[in-house]
């Protein structure tokens, strides 16, 4: 599942993920994402941090706090921090959200597919 509020970004990432052989469901904010997960639990969620209605950290917190969805791997997408950074901001956000991983925007297609594959194989 992909949750992001930018329709152009969603379409681009959807094409990337589908090229890896994965089915992709889409939601455009955290609340819509929670509702979609309640209908059908995905194997993995790629979740943007900054969105209207409910941001990615709030959605991640709700998903990880629910026994029904706590085991679903979540990859946060952020335009704020680089993946390789050791900044306080990056680590604090990662720990507070309980997400399994994160990736900076703009995403690198090959890296995103590798990250998705690695979490689905665990």
Please provide the spans of the model-predicted regions.
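Short amphipathic alpha-helix used as the core "switch/output" element in two-component signaling
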Residues: 35, 57-70
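Helix N-cap/capping motif at the beta->alpha junctions
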Residues: 26-35, 56
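Receiver (REC) domain active-site loop signature in two-component systems and cognate sites
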Residues: 51
């Amino acid at each position: 599942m992909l949750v992001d509020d930018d329709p152009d970004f969603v379409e681009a990432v959807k094409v990337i993920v589908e090229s890896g052989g994965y089915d992709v469901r889409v939601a455009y904010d955290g609340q819509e994402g929670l509702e979609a997960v309640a209908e059908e639990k995905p194997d993995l969620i790629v979740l943007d941090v900054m969105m209207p209605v409910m941001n990615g950290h709030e959605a991640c917190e709700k998903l990880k706090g629910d026994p029904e969805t706590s085991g679903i791997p979540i990859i946060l997408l952020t335009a704020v921090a680089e993946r390789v950074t050791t900044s306080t901001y990056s680590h604090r956000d990662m720990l507070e959200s309980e997400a399994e991983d994160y990736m900076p925007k703009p995403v690198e297609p090959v890296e995103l597919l590798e990250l998705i594959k690695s979490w689905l194989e665990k």
